[in-house]
C-alpha cells in the first residue's frame, strides 16, 4: 500500500503538502520514512498488539490469531510518482478463525489535530481517505474510521486487484461524539485485514457512524491469512 497519505477534509486538495492552509492528516503516507528498519524480520507480525514493524507511523493491531505476516518497505517503479511502498506477505495462514481474532494496519491521531473536523457538532465535516493498493489476487478489505473517545465507527469496503488501483472513499461527518481536544489518541484509521465474528457477525452498513462492534467489518471481507500466497502492497 502506498499513499494512504490522503486523509483530509472533503473538498480539500489531497496532497502530501500544505496548500493554502489545507493539510493532509496522515503522516508518511508515501511510505518513505522507515527509521525502525525496512523489514519486520522473520518472526512475523501478528503475535503482539500495537506494533510498529517498519515504516514510521503505521501500526499493527492484532489479537488471538495464529496467522503471521512479514512487513517490508519496498522500492517500486511501477506506480508513477511513487518510489516506496509497504509489502505485507502472509507467512503463516490461519483459516480456523475464532470469534475474537483481529488484524488491522493503521495510523493513530491525537484529538488536538482533528478539531477542524468538527466531529460531534451539526457542522461535522466529511472526511476523504485515498490511497493506492494492489495484491497477489483479488480481495476485499475494510477501511474504518474509529472514534476512540466515543467508541464509534464508520467503515467501507474496498477492492484489491493484481494491479495498482487508486481507492478513494468519503466518510460522512459524525454529529455525535466530539473528539477530545488534547494530545491523547482520539481517532484511528484502520485497514481491517482479518477479523472474527465479534467484528464481522452483524450486518454491515457502509458509511454509517455507529457503536455496534459486530458491524465494524464489511460483509465481503477477505482474510489476509487465508493463504501463504497472500500479499498486500
Q: Where are each of the predicted segments found?
A:
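Extracellular and organelle-lumenal recognition/adhesion modules and their flexible linkers in secreted
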Residues: 3-233
